[in-house]
Amino acid sequence: MISIMDRSEIVARENPVITQRVTNLLQTNAPLLFMPIDIHEVRYGAYTLFMYGSLENGYKAEVRIENIPVFFDVQIEFNDTNQLFLKSLLTAENIAYERLETLTQRPVMGYREKEKEFAPYIRIFFKSLYEQRKAITYLNNMGYNTAADDTTCYYRMVSRELKLPLTSWIQLQHYSYEPRGLVHRFSVTPEDLVSYQDDGPTDHSIVMAYDIETYSPVKGTVPDPNQANDVVFMICMRIFWIHSTEPLASTCITMAPCKKSSEWTTILCSSEKNLLLSFAEQFSRWAPDICTGFNDSRYDWPFIVEKSMQHGILEEIFNKMSLFWHQKLDTILKCYYVKEKRVKISAEKSIISSFLHTPGCLPIDVRNMCMQLYPKAEKTSLKAFLENCGLDSKVDLPYHLMWKYYETRDSEKMADVAYYCIIDAQRCQDLLVRHNVIPDRREVGILSYTSLYDCIYYAGGHKVCNMLIAYAIHDEYGRIACSTIARGKREHGKYPGAFVIDPVKGLEQDKPTTGLDFASLYPSLIMAYNFSPEKFVASRDEAKSLMAKGESLHYVSFHFNNRLVEGWFVRHNNVPDKMGLYPKVLIDLLNKRTALKQELKKLGEKKECIHESHPGFKELQFRHAMVDAKQKALKIFMNTFYGEAGNNLSPFFLLPLAGGVTSSGQYNLKLVYNFVINKGYGIKYGDTDSLYITCPDSLYTEVTDAYLNSQKTIKHYEQLCHEKVLLSMKAMSTLCAEVNEYLRQDNGTSYLRMAYEEVLFPVCFTGKKKYYGIAHVNTPNFNTKELFIRGIDIIKQGQTKLTKTIGTRIMEESMKLRRPEDHRPPLIEIVKTVLKDAVVNMKQWNFEDFIQTDAWRPDKDNKAVQIFMSRMHARREQLKKHGAAASQFAEPEPGERFSYVIVEKQVQFDIQGHRTDSSRKGDKMEYVSEAKAKNLPIDILFYINNYVLGLCARFINENEEFQPPDNVSNKDEYAQRRAKSYLQKFVQSIHPKDKSVIKQGIVHRQCYKYVHQEIKKKIGIFADLYKEFFNNTTNPIESFIQSARFMIQYSDGEQKVNHSMKKMVEQRATLASKPAGKPAGNPAGNPAGNALMRAIFTQLITEEKKIVQALYNKGDAIHDLLTYIINNINYKIATFQTKQMLTFEFSSTHVELLLKLNKTWLILAGIHVAKKHLQALLDSYNNEPPSRTFIQQAIEEECGSIKPSCYDFIS
């Protein structure tokens, strides 16, 4: 360890000039620049805020901020009586406070006229956050309105009040300084901190990327930290400047000898315990500001912590890693080991992270960051994300080889493992830098006055709320008192829906269609109509009074939860002083972003003119990345703004505002719709914030006539289309200007504007939010390989390559330019042609074409995934019982996506000829690795019917034959269902396997129908023979004997019938057992005839048991006999059903035994003799199935010449 450089030494080596300057500043106590990375609060006793980060040269620094006032505000008239009353309330609750101050602020909810604009507040100061929180809770429960009432993260309030961002350069002034080892410690007061307004110098914070390698002696399993024999045998670490991918130093800590390398320092440890301690020691020497790994919050950190616990060294490890605070084990586990932190990936998805958060080092899981950047990514592996970015891939080293190298302790091979491990760490930093993750998050923190930790681990709405409060509390925005606590009744319901014009479905090949969109509709509406909580008027009388005084009001009304919600917002009429908080903030963000985008454009132009080898290229590239990060952060806040305004958990939530924005969106889209229609334009589709418009036919008259008068070649037609696109662009530019002027006249502002992005021609609308076409942006471009696609299922997450390919083929074929004089195939013809080729020529598809992905969410009712995971769990348990590896059936982490295919199962039928093999998706799913390993056949028909046909039906459901009657409400759903049914019949007509399966079902049904008729006939005769016994109550025994004799005589007379029936059953059973056709190389199921007969046999036993039950109920005199018979029949049926008679054949001993019972009770005269043989048979059966010889002898002895067979039983 001594030979490895620590952080200070590395900084001095890399930045000697800056280090000398920083040293001089420290010696003279001159102002210093400090970049905060991590924040920690001391909440007990006097409140203290600690910020950790680096100085300008890269030195590790701790800034301790003391004398921070702890307070909150309460709205109350500040006269002596009220102050005394407030004091008495606090005193009565034993709440210790320091002092009270009076101030005036504007309440955030409700409009107040000029003379009543500000309300009195009392600011209460405390010695600790504990007393502050007690007082806030008490006064809120008493009904008082509070403000500046942060109770969880008080540092956010400090940042807002001081206007001191926690993620950018801060200048330290008048500090006290104490060097301690690698850490430079500063103590300041809030007044000694100054926000550095310029971009500042290059940040020299240090990132440590790491990776661990683990081993398990149980092959094929994922190493589990809870298993004593599973170990971490290697940890590789590499450090970088935060903005660079060039490593500053690298270390490999290993338990197996490893050949030395010039790329890293190797530390050999004798045990896992020593390896973990060495990791902590090296961590402390480098003192990183950020620690990152790939999926380390799901695997690496839990493994390290659990193993440290097992070795009893977690406290020692934490205190080595933490340069600042030493803690006891219980405090570490409670406060610093974050076991379950829910990280939001997208609106629908979150992921659980676990990590050890040592003060001064911020943990970042690169996988989580990449998943947030690519929320719809089907693969979330390190290799997949590297491929998406075009970065160098990771090293390919299978786990079984890695474990083999570890077991053999081959130093040469272990060097390969070390290289694999250290490159994984390198790629984490590559991804962070490529995606500009840290600068992007920092800019969000600067705008929202939150920490870097907040920007990584909290959702966007939380940061918008904090930003609003930061704007509101300052004088230039009106000194508005804001609470962080949501109040009022939390209602759930739907706001007014968007204005939608149903699409004109079908393929448009004659006229271009242009999209006209509102630019940032909801933020624009907020700015235009002054939607802000402090501009809201709830009372109609107050609204009338304000209008009488000359105020302009915007009225909103909508229905919510079966009641009318209405209100008014005071308009600003373009007067800055009248603008509300929301419009002011949005306008400020918009102006900042506009300026940044202009600067970004200039920097981009410079980058194109300078070669990468130029000395100033890196600086220019860095500046471009920083400006881009700032404008992205502004965009995020503007887009998230309405979401927070409509969030009923937000302290800013106001129902009339949330619904008023959406209802105003409706109004304005209708306004534009009517304007465009009245101008003679056509509407193809409209939804929420956009209209798809076609120009009047007269616009194209001249170019169309020119084409008609030409030779009408394909070249002439292409020229016609080219000119139509140009004319549409010009017309839309004019129309767009007219629409914006019309909107300006209507709402009195220029904030609400529309713009057109592209002309689509040809274009096809298949449903709401579903369309595709060729997009022409600046110039005409008829490339069918670059389609503009919205909402079509081929871009849906988890979709197979098969569906994407078929859908793409249909769209590309339909987009080809075809002259009116040529045959223009209707879309249904194109779909059928592509579909037929896909179904008939199945050899064109590869295994990879059928791979799907889905997410495992245990709390979501995804039946297919739930069934599949249940099957995989059963497989794992079964394999574990036999001591076999089960990792190939491992369950993904909740929220994680997994890959699978649908495989073909054996076709089976029940007694009536109905399919009994499961058609449920969950029963057919298999992991990709398992399907590949066992070469399982793909169920192509399942993919066609369940995925492809739905997509294809979407293209053709506008056809007249699929349209619903007038009384159907959901016409699109009806047409889609009919179109899919049509295509299913089309596939059945061309798919050979489907035909063969249908034929098998027909054969089974015919066989069953014939046999069932015979069974019914013979059971009816049987019942008639015993009719006299059923009706005779005086002498039941004699009647039973007589009926039994009739039955024997009848049975002897039926031999010819039985023989005929036997042949028929044999014939049909043989037909049913013939193998069916096997299309596309996939074996079809072919159930044997004995399976059919087995089912019929069970049904017969059930029917005869009913008759025996009737006999039992009728004759007490033969109670013992029939009880014996019934019990044994029940026993045999139960045995048959539970054991399923795997060795069962028509002539098997089991059938003979059941037959013996049947014949014996019919021959009542010999029943008392047969009892002993039946008992002997049953005793024998309990041990092993009786031999055929034994049964045959017993039957011949007791029943004479009756020769049993399985077919006799049918009679």
From Swiss-Prot:
GO terms for molecular function: DNA binding; DNA-directed DNA polymerase activity; nucleotide binding. It catalyses: DNA(n) + a 2'-deoxyribonucleoside 5'-triphosphate = DNA(n+1) + diphosphate. Residues 1074-1089 are annotated as: 4 X 4 AA tandem repeats of [NK]-[P]-A-G. GO terms for biological process: DNA-templated DNA replication; viral DNA genome replication. Induction: Expressed in the early phase of the viral replicative cycle. Gene3D superfamilies: DNA polymerase family B, C-terminal domain, Helix hairpin bin, Palm domain of DNA polymerase, Ribonuclease H-like superfamily/Ribonuclease H. The keyword Nucleus does not apply. Keywords: DNA replication, DNA-binding, DNA-directed DNA polymerase, Early protein, Nucleotidyltransferase, Repeat, Transferase, Viral DNA replication. It is an enzyme of class 2 (transferase). InterPro entries: DNA-dir_DNA_pol_B (IPR006172), DNA-dir_DNA_pol_B_CS (IPR017964), DNA-dir_DNA_pol_B_exonuc (IPR006133), DNA-dir_DNA_pol_B_multi_dom (IPR006134), DNA/RNA_pol_sf (IPR043502), DNA_pol_B_thumb (IPR042087), DNA_pol_palm_dom_sf (IPR023211), DNA_pol_type-B (IPR050240). It holds the Pfam family DNA_pol_B. Coiled coil: none annotated. Sequence repeats lie at residues 1074-1077, 1078-1081, 1082-1085, 1086-1089. Its EC number is 2.7.7.7. Consistent with its intracellular location, ASFV encodes its own replicative DNA polymerase and three base excision repair enzymes: a class II AP endonuclease, the repair polymerase Pol X, and an ATP-dependent DNA ligase. Belongs to the DNA polymerase type-B family. DNA-directed DNA polymerase involved in viral DNA replication. This is DNA polymerase beta. It comes from African swine fever virus (strain Badajoz 1971 Vero-adapted).
